[in-house]
């Protein structure tokens, strides 16, 4: 069976990796704020850049998360979303609660370990993607700015880029109306 894969950020990287490793299993791709080649050089969010560049054992990161989690979550979310009004107390509380779940930090820490696999294994082959591909990008993305999405669009032959105004790295949350419309229209073609 084949599936249309939809992924945001690292999830878009997984979707691209799946399309390259098992093209026969993929029918279409929807990449939302997708993972580019040269992630460390392309990321502009100071918090995410710091997380990628700071090696720390997971026990230390877990302790830091326990101690400073709420402040860290708010800082990261302010860099990720365009409209800070979305960061209501309820959203921050829920995000912090999710971040405090036991065992959440070690899997997040594996990003540093798996980034070389992405860069050396899949990122160098993005131009080989042959599936119909929709790229959705927030015009105000501060994790990977719009020119990164435009470059991804040029690299994946035949792809379509949809720019979402007044949205950052999570346009499906910030502008679900425009994001969902673009995805549904693409998947129904």
Regions found by a protein language model. Name each.
Residues 40-43, 64-128:
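Conserved alpha/beta-hydrolase catalytic His-Asp/Glu region
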Residues 129, 135-137:
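Short beta-strand/loop motif that positions the catalytic acidic residue
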Residues 14-18:
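Hydrolases whose catalytic domains are alpha/beta-hydrolase-1, hotdog thioesterase
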Residues 158-189:
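Catalytic active-site module of serine/aspartate enzymes centered on a nucleophile-bearing elbow/loop
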Residues 20, 27-62:
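Flexible "cap/lid" loop of the alpha/beta hydrolase fold
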Residues 140-144:
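Acidic catalytic loop of the alpha/beta-hydrolase fold
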Residues 1-9:
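Alpha/beta-hydrolase fold nucleophile elbow
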Residues 91, 122, 131, 145-154:
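Short alpha-helix in the alpha/beta-hydrolase fold that links the catalytic acid
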């Amino acid at each position: 069976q084949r599936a249309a894969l939809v992924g945001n950020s690292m999830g878009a990287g997984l979707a691209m990796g799946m399309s390259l490793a098992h093209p026969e299993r993929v029918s279409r791709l929807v990449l939302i704020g997708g993972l580019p080649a040269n992630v460390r050089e392309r990321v502009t969010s100071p918090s995410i850049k710091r997380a990628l560049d700071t090696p720390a054992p997971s026990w230390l990161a877990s302790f830091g998360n326990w101690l400073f989690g709420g402040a860290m979550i708010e800082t990261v979310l302010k860099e990720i979303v365009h409209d800070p009004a979305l960061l209501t107390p309820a959203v921050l509380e829920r995000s912090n609660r999710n971040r405090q779940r036991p065992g959440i930090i070690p899997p997040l820490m594996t990003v540093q370990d798996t980034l070389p696999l992405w860069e050396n294994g899949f990122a160098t082959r993005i131009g080989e993607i042959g599936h119909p591909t929709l790229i959705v990008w927030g015009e105000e993305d501060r994790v990977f700015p719009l020119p990164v999405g435009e470059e991804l669009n040029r690299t994946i032959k035949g792809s379509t880029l949809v720019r979402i105004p007044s949205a950052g790295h999570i346009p499906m949350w910030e502008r679900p109306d425009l994001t969902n419309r673009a995805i549904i229209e693409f998947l129904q073609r």
